[in-house]
Each structure stands twice: as C-alpha cells, then as structure tokens.
C-alpha cells in the first residue's frame, strides 16, 4: 500500500473513533507485525497475479460469466462470502455468495469429489440482492445475507440445487455475516453500516429459525456486552445499543466470537462465556507497523486455530492472525497483484484443512470475479518463523 493511501486510511480510521468504541483503549493485545511470514516472504505473482509463499500453489476454479469446467453452470458475478460443507462421499461443497444488485444475486456452489476435483456446479439461491457474507450452521445449512437496508437472511441447503428459505426473524438491515454458536444455536450477526449493530438471534429451539428473539449488543464501560431485545423489521439504532463501524466477517471457535469492523480497521474477540469484548487487532494503534487494513471476510483454520482475515481493499491481501505469546501476530498469506479494482472475498478451508478457497471479487479487469483453490502446508499455519 502506498504511503499516501496508508495515511488517508489512518486519518479515516481516526475520524471513525468518535464514540465509546472509538475511544477503546489501545491494548497490548491489539496485534503485532511479524518480521517474516510463517513460511517466508511471498513469491512473485503467478499468471493470475496470485502471490503465495514457497510451497503453496493456486488453481483457478471459476471465472464470472464462464462455464465451470466440466459443467453447464456459469459462475456468478461478484463472488463474496463462502464456506465449505462435507458430503457423504468424503467430498465437499464450496458455496459462494453473489454480491449483485437488483435481485440478480444469489449463491453458487462447487461440488468436489474426495480427490478435490469438481464434479458439479449449481445454484442454491437466486433472485436476491447483494448477497455479501453469511455463515455455515452446525446443522449443515448456509446462511446467505443481503447487504441492503431491507436485507434479509436466507437459509440454503448447500448439497443440492434449489432455493433458500427467507428467515425474517434474523432481522431486516444491512446484513453482512452470521456465526452460529454450536453449543446453543445462537446466531451472531454483523451489520455493514457506519452505525451498524452487532445482533444476536436466540432461537426457541436449536436449529429452528422460525421462532426466537433478536437482540442488539450494548457494550458497557467494563467492556462486557449485554443484550437488548429489538424489532426485526428495520435496522435498529436505539441509544440502548452500541454502534460498530461497519461490521464485517464473523466466526466462532472455542467459545469466542471473532468479527471485523472495516471502517476503523479492527478485529474483535467476544467471549461468549464471560461476555467480555476486546480488540485483538487495531491498525490505527499499530500505525506504520500495521499490515492489515479494512478487514472484511474472515475464517478460521480448524486444525490449527489460525484466523484468516481478508482485506476489503488495502493491499488486497489475505492475512494470517495467529496467537503467539499472548499476542496476535499478523502475516500475509495471499496477495493479489494487479487486481486493483477488486477485493479479497470468501476465504474458506476444505473440511480437512488442506485446501483454501478464496476469490478476487472483480478480478484483474475490475469486472469478472475469479475463484481460486490454494494448496500448501496449511497444517503448519501456527509454526513460528
């Protein structure tokens, strides 16, 4: 990232720092920059502009508007949030949202056999608007979220072609991501708006989203969160809740909810057990040492506990955040060179943790998205340099 843009981002982040969360203490846990990547520096870009460390390789799987190889299915425009799901035949499915306006969005799916080869491609949702991120559920469905003022969440079956079911009780607002607590079935939802809220849906019955209560987070002075019941028919902006500066990706692991806010360049961790909230990465606090700006989609490598965070813009990187010695270390894992009009979207690992799926939303020409599979020694993600 050039220095003028970095300074502009720092100023814009400071302008966002105007409320309770803006004045959040710059804690020691707000991240640190690694001297070198866990696998060494990124190498020269490949033919598609993908930069990876030594030992990693990228394969282009699908391009917007083109038939997925071996199928009669055209890949959608603007691929965004994604996830993988295991299949009974030891394969898996990768789903990808289409962030397209005017009811032209939806969700596409790539099905792989046990060897990692594509055997089918199909749609699991159509006719929706700006499907941004979302999240997988423990019961095997995909929650696809619309990022518009009247946005809704749709629950989709990833394993077969079909149409999702709208879930209005999850709220009507600028939806971004959804993360489900596997223990309780509670769903945590982010909102991509400058005055967005962090929401929680408490279903009456585990895995059933047609009854339950929607709540918004209120952050106390002691950095603990309490939850306030809110209506479901419009974005909530009550004074009894806390604004987050454009909520983005979300993921739950080991009783912690991790989520990003792109306007103030932060990644957060909320302890579901203790209700405590903390900042684990803060680009503004790090200043010139920061390498991750405008954090967006995120996912976790289940086998190692490493957190991967995609940049909305910035240097078009996928950044590894890994806990070491009580701090979160940030290192680049993927960078897209020559994709200046794009953003990094949809990171998700195969169920066995050996393959990473990720997209350049608008590709090298600024119009046609590119979805990749990256292979390499991912099981060493937490290894020190």
For each of these PLM feature ranges, what is it?
Residues 1-7:
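N-terminal secretory signal peptides
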Residues 8-385:
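Sequence/structural signature of beta-propeller domains
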């Amino acid at each position: 990232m050039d220095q003028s843009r970095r300074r502009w981002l720092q100023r814009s982040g400071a302008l966002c720092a105007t409320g309770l969360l803006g004045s959040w203490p710059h804690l020691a846990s707000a991240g640190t920059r690694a001297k070198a990547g866990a696998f060494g520096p990124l190498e020269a870009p490949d033919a598609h502009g993908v930069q990876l460390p030594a030992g990693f390789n990228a394969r282009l799987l699908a391009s917007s508007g083109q038939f997925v190889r071996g199928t009669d299915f055209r890949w959608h425009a603007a691929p965004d949030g994604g996830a993988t799901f295991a299949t009974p035949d030891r394969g898996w499915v990768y789903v990808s949202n289409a962030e397209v306006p005017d009811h032209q969005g939806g969700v596409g799916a790539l099905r792989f056999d046990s060897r990692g080869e594509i055997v089918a491609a199909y749609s699991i949702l159509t006719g929706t608007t700006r499907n941004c991120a979302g999240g997988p559920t423990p019961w095997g469905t995909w929650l696809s979220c619309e990022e518009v003022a009247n946005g809704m969440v749709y629950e989709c079956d990833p394993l077969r072609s079909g149409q999702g079911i709208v879930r209005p009780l999850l709220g009507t607002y600028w939806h971004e991501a959804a993360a489900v607590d596997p223990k309780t079935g509670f769903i945590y939802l982010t909102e991509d708006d400058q005055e967005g809220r962090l929401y929680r849906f408490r279903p009456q019955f585990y895995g059933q989203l047609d009854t339950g209560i929607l709540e918004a987070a209120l952050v106390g002075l002691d950095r603990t969160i309490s939850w306030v019941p809110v209506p479901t028919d419009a974005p909530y902006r009550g004074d009894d809740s806390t604004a987050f500066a454009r909520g983005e990706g979300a993921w739950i692991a080991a009783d912690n909810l991790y989520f990003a806010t792109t306007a103030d360049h932060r990644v957060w961790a909320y302890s579901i057990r203790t209700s405590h909230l903390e900042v684990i990465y803060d680009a503004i606090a790090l200043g010139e040492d920061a390498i991750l700006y405008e954090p967006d989609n995120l996912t976790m490598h289940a086998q190692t506990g490493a957190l991967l965070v995609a940049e909305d813009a910035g240097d078009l990187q996928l950044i590894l955040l890994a806990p070491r010695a009580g701090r979160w270390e940030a290192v680049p894992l993927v960078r897209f060179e020559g994709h200046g009009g794009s953003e990094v979207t949809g990171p998700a690992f195969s169920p066995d943790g050996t393959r990473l799926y990720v997209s350049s939303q608008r590709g090298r020409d600024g119009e046609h998205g590119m979805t990749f599979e990256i292979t390499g020694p991912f099981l060493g993600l937490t290894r020190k340099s």
